[in-house]
Design a protein with these regions (language model features):
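Enzymes that bind and transform nitrogen-containing heteroaromatic metabolites
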Residues: 9-256
Length: 256
């Protein structure tokens, strides 16, 4: 795999300390992410991007903000330049107060050079449609969100959300149904939450895992990054690359 680590690091990444080896040369996270080979013939390539503490907590104080750092946010932004669609569950949209997807000029240019649209499209999954039409995520009419829901979704909420988003009823909202709806995509990035990602893991619809390990121990009863039915058999992943931040560790896993 091409690391894309040669040459000067662009100004927007100079605050980050992401390196190929501890104390080694800085790499450009965007170049690295755009260089990885991705794609499969039968369905979109699915990436999960998550941060966890050393002791496995994926949610602290209701979200992941407490365990992020600057390097993680830099890598998060680089990974967001990759997909056609960003898929996220409604609970995470509420907990993290999602905003409309936007990318800086450099990431937009990298996407256009790769044959992608300037900005990935945000897709929110919810069976209950328990979302506030006035939420920040719906604040940019030029970045209209798609909401995927099931046949039993409440009609009143469907009508209200249709004013600010494209709401689509599916026969079911299993990972297979979601990927079938998004079948024209090459890459889908799942940003959670743990329940949504757990369903993808259990269904075997995982191709890549971008995992940030934050140097914290929190104990408590926090859920893991994948929560729900067990994968049977467990999904075997291969460690493809390790990068080092000033504090955090970045692991890229792919299916063998």
């Amino acid at each position: 795999m091409d690391a894309g680590g040669g040459g000067a690091v662009p100004a927007r990444y100079r605050r980050s300390m992401i390196r190929e080896t501890p104390g080694g040369e800085q790499i450009d996270p965007l170049e690295a992410q755009m260089s990885y080979p991705r794609g499969r013939p039968d369905r979109p390539w699915v990436i999960g991007n998550f941060v966890t503490t050393i002791d496995g907590a994926a949610v602290v104080d209701g979200g992941s903000t407490a365990i992020n750092d600057d390097d993680d946010m830099t890598m998060f932004g680089a990974i967001r330049a990759v997909p056609d669609f960003i898929l996220v569950g409604a609970e995470t949209v509420r907990a993290e107060n999602y905003r409309p997807i936007d990318l800086d000029e450099r990431r937009r240019r990298a996407r256009l050079e790769a044959g992608l649209e300037e900005v990935p499209h945000l897709v929110v999954v919810t069976r209950s449609l328990d979302l506030d039409p006035k939420a920040r995520v719906f604040g940019d009419p030029k970045r209209r969100v798609t909401i995927l829901t099931g046949e039993s979704a409440p009609a009143e909420r469907f009508a209200a959300l249709s004013e600010v988003a494209d709401v689509v009823r599916l026969d079911a909202t299993t990972p297979g149904d979601l990927l079938h709806y998004l079948r024209m995509a090459r890459v889908v990035l799942c940003e959670g939450g743990p329940g949504t990602w757990g369903q993808f893991v259990a269904a075997g619809h995982v191709d890549e895992m971008a995992l940030t390990v934050s140097p914290m121990l929190v104990s408590g009863v926090s859920v893991r990054l994948a929560h729900g039915p067990a994968a049977d058999p467990p999904l075997e992943m291969r460690l493809d690359r390790t990068l080092y931040g000033d504090r955090s560790l970045f692991l890229r896993y792919v299916r063998p």
